[in-house]
Every structure is written in C-alpha cells, then in structure tokens.
Amino acid sequence: MRKIERIFITISLFAVVTVTASAIWHNLNKPEQGAVQSIPTTKYGAFLATQHAVFVNDFDTAVKLTENLRDVESPIVQNTIYLSDFLAGKMPLDAHLLKNEKSMPARLIYDAYLIQNDNWKELYNRHKSDDSALAAPLRIWAAVANDKQADALKFIEKLPTNSSWKSFVRGQIYAEKKDYKKAAENFMAVDPSFLNINDYLYIMSFYIHHDMIDKASKLLKEFTSMRGGMCMLAYDNIPEWSRFAGYKNQLAFSLVQNVSHTQIMMYSDLAMLLLRFVQITAPEFATSNNVMDYYLGNFFYHNTGNWQKHFDNISQDSPYYLFGLLRSADKTGKIDKLQEAQKKHPLFVPAVNKLVAHHIQHGNKSDALRIIRHAMNDEHLNDAGRAFFAKGRAQINFAFGDLDAAQSDLHKVSEALALDAEILSLQAKIWAMQNRELDNAYEYAMKLVKHNPADVLAWDTLGLVVAKREGADAALDVLERVGEVSTTCSSLFEHLGDIYASKGDVNKAIDSYVRAIELSDDGLTVIPLIEKKIRKLK
C-alpha cells in the first residue's frame, strides 16, 4: 500500500501544533451555533466543506461530509478523513498507516491506535527517549505497562514541574502496581491547593476503595476548607476505583489532568486532540461523572462549536453539573437555571459569586443577602466557611453604602481568616469612605499595589484612599492612568466619575459612570445608584 504522505502538512488550517498549544483551527468568522450545512453533491465540494467544518469545530458534520470521500486516494483527502474521524471521537480505519508520520496529530492518532490494541511495548519504544512535556503521560504509562516503573519514576524526577504533580503521578504508579502504602504516602504529599475536582475524586476513590477512611476524612476536610472545594462538602457520589484503575484509565486521567491544569492548553486546539484521545482509548473513564462532557464543552465554549450540547449532557448528580450551568449563564446572561440549582447547592462558590454580583449590579440588595444567608445556614459549613461568606456579605453592604454593617462583618472575618487582599482592600475603602484611619488605609492600599501591580482593584483602592487623604487632583493622577488601560473593575470608573463630578467636569463624569455601568457585572457597583448620579448631573 502506498506510503501516506506526511499528514496535515498540506492542510492550511493545521499548519502547526506545538506543546504551547498554538492555535490550529481559530476561526475569525464564527458561524451561528446550530447552523445547518447542506451536503455538497460533488466530491470536491464535499472535500472543501469538510475542511471548513473542521475549521469551525463542527466535527460531526465533517465526518458526514467525508462519507463520499472514502474511496478518494489523494493524500490530502485521506489526511482530512483521518483528522475528521479522530476529532469526532472515532479511530480512523487506517490509523495503522500513520506509524512513521512525524507531525503531532498523526503521532497522537497512531499512539491512540496502539493503546486501543494494547500494544504498550511499541508505545514504549516510541516514547522512551521523548522528553517533551506533551508526551510525558505517554512515556510514563508506557513504561509502567512494560514493568519499567523505575524508568518512569526517574523520568518524573527530571521533569521541570511542581512537586505536587510529581507526588500525584508517583502515587498513581504505586497504586497501579498495588503498593498501596507508598501510593498513599505520595497522595498525602500533594498540596490540597493543587487539586481540582477530578484530582480530588481520584484520590478519594483510592482511599475509600482501600479502606483508608482516616485519610479520606482528612482530605475531605482540607479540600472543602478552600472556596473551590466547599461544594464537595455534602458530595458522596465518589466514582468506583475501577474507573481509574488500569493502564488505559490511568493514562486517560493523566492526559485530562494535564489539560485541566494548563490553562493555555485547556482552551487550545491541542486540548481537543488529547480529549478525543481519552475518549477513544478509555471510554469507561471518559463517561465517569461527565468529566469529558465538561472539558469538551469548555473547549467549544472558549472557541466555537456546540458547547451547549456537552453541558446539557452533564447529569445533575455530577460535580460538573453546576459548572456547566455557570458557563451557560456567563454565555447567555440567563441565570434562572443557575439560581434554582444554587438553592440546592448553596456552597457552590462560583455560583454564589455570580448571583451576588448580578443582584448587586441590578440593585437587589435583599436578594444578594439572601444567597449569602442561605449558604451560611448550611449545616455542613465550618467556621472558616462562614467567615468566607461573611466577607461576601461585607462586600454587599459596602456596595450599598451600609458601612457600619460592612465593618462589623469585616471585624468578625479578620478574627477567623488570614488577612488577604480582599479584606485589606475592603477595610481600606471603608476607612476612606468614613474619612478616618487614613494613614492606615493608605498603608493597606500601598501594600496591595506593591504586592500585585497588575491588580486594578488595588489601584482603585489606592485612588479612593488618596482622594480622601490628599485630594481630588492627587487621586486623578492615580486613577486616570489606570483607567486608560483598564477593561475591568467597575468601581474604579465610578470613583473616577465621583472625582470628575466634584471638580465640575460633567462630561468626563458621565463618561466614567457609563463605563462603570458597562463593567458592572463584576458586582462592585450598583447600576441604579450610578444612574441616580448621572441624573443629578444632567
């Protein structure tokens, strides 16, 4: 059979795929979601339409369009067929022909073919000298599958990554090789702040399956003490260990972990190749807790394609269900479903933040406070969790001008939580608005700016304090320069508007207030209050 030419080289949209996740299929003119494409009657038309379908991430349509192209022997056409099949989650029929190809997509497709056929020996030989970060999971698990875990452990030590990841993957290897004591030791060495929900479920499943209840309880306490993990306090639908055990499942987990922990990769076209790799090689893992639906939906959400289909597929007992609703609310602006779900899951912090910001934005103080109160009344919440939500209540009261209530909450919060940037910023703003403790407020604000000069909220805090401490002109020196380049932080523009209004510059004041309204979905300003200020100027 003829030698397949180097795959994808002649397809313009696949000009480059790198470990840094350079764009492959970015589309400047995105079609309307759900648009129906007609099937061309000519082979040439079908070929062009297939390339376009891949270009706009409509992979299912791409596969349908290739049905009349399967007998065309042109390398360009065959390459397009291979790619369309794989990106739709199907192993290409002639994937074995890609053995000697060098491009990244072709190598991944052939690697998936080897794993699907349990040919771990050839996979190991292909990757045993591969030092690339992208291929690390393939090299590690091919070595382990060939009883060369010593090689895998040595390779892990050489990788320029953080210690928690190294401990995690070492734990995976020991767990797979049934050295449960060493596995547990490594899992316990993982910093809880490293874990996302998928990582947490993996370790919890390991602990529960192997009767390590004390360790499971410790992990539950540590993970749920963080704002991102609070939603798991009452969650008990931990997957069976069989969903993670086995070389295929372990590799699949590692690939998803790499995608989920690398933000630049998570939203890139490289992520789609790896996620389809997982679906094809480890279908049992891929259906566990709708993890793949969430990450596939995330890819389409941040690019183009039918993200809604994947989020809608997530079952209500999945920990990813609420994240899917949150993404949908962000995209559509409709919060009804998220609001109903949050009533059942009051400790899902991203939903709390989203809904509170929405109610502050629209002047619904009582609704914003009700969400916080509902969370604080949850029986599973610990003292640190209540303090966290009390900090949110302080922000609500500050936004609506109830400074005494905000200060009261902040005193309680500072007794239970370490002083973070949010606490320091809010305290400095309260003092500034009350025109007291201005030297301390200035010290707090300067500390925030020095700690993170890129934080617009820190500059907003400094500007508000300087306005009270040194006057409007000094504050303008701070806020105007930041406002020229800032696309976030509605309160900064409200404060700019206040200063312009105090100086009698009506036009600049109104422009700043309008900009504050445009950015007000961050929950830092109240639209009805800003509109009232605008009316007073007209």
Each predicted region: which residue ranges?
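C-terminal soluble interaction/assembly domains
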Residues: L426, T461-L464, K468, E480, ...
